[in-house]
């Protein structure tokens, strides 16, 4: 399970869910920078989208390894942010010309330390914070999208879709039980290679809790209710990812690990994304 090589014949899919509600106007320390939660969400999403495009580049051009969808929820509704139809193939995405900006980013260096490094960043999506938080409605839409994708004959043997939800964890259209139920439905969808992976990234303004990535159960004891609920909504990371997660967390890390992170630095958030969105086998 979770071993299928990602190729142009056996493609995979990524869904990035972005909380764009009014609560994202709050400011948060993101690594060494202060910004709004909406800016942190957009920054993280833009970094992931650019990485997905870069991973598909070969000497003969961008290979069509996966479909990508970005689902925004806020302003009292759900919207597709890359393409109105939902999915966009990565080669079509690469042909777009997003706005560029320069930003100083906390980057993990080879010696394990973090340093501020200036990067040029593509802006595929822009920060937005307005209205309520229809996370349940967004999960319903994503459930149907990934189910339809997995049902297609050409995708049935593929590495399963990966859903990454970036939020401050406060839905307005459901209670905790209902959110847990719809997330369970999303995780229950599968290809022959495994179930959909649902990762939650909790953007929090708290500066009193330690940052945690791929938490174990005992690391969630001091977390707030929203973080604990998001952890229960997340996938338990498969054994195929255990070694990479152990290397990230260090000595004392023992599975099972929840597919989430909270109160994390920029470098840690990107580590979550990198591990969660990397097949354990090479792309060919």
For the regions a protein language model found, what residue spans apply to each?
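Acidic, low-complexity intrinsically disordered regions
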Residues: 1-284
């Amino acid at each position: 399970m979770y071993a299928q090589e990602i190729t142009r014949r056996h493609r995979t899919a990524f869904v990035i869910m972005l909380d764009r509600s009014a609560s994202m106007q709050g400011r948060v320390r993101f690594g060494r920078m202060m910004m709004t939660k909406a800016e942190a969400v957009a920054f993280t999403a833009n970094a992931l989208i650019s990485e997905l495009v870069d991973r598909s580049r070969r000497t003969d051009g961008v290979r069509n390894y996966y479909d990508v969808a970005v689902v925004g929820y806020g302003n009292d509704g759900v919207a597709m942010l890359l393409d109105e139809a939902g999915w966009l193939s990565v080669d079509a995405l690469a042909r777009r010309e997003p706005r560029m900006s320069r930003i100083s980013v906390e980057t993990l260096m080879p010696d394990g330390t973090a340093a501020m490094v200036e990067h040029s960043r593509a802006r595929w999506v822009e920060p937005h914070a307005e209205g309520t938080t229809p996370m349940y409605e967004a999960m319903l839409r994503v459930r149907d999208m990934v189910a339809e994708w997995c049902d297609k004959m050409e995708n049935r043997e593929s590495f399963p879709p990966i859903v990454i939800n970036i939020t401050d964890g406060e839905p307005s259209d459901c209670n905790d039980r209902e959110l847990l139920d719809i997330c369970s439905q999303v995780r229950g969808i599968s290809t022959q290679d495994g179930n959909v992976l649902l990762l939650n990234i909790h953007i929090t303004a708290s500066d009193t809790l330690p940052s945690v990535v791929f938490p174990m159960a005992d690391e969630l004891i001091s977390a707030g209710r929203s973080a604990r609920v998001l952890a229960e909504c997340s996938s338990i990371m498969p054994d195929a990812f255990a070694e990479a997660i152990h290397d990230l967390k260090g000595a004392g890390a023992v599975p099972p690990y929840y597919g989430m992170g909270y109160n994390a630095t920029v470098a840690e958030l990107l580590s979550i994304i990198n591990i969660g969105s990397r097949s354990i086998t090479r792309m060919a």
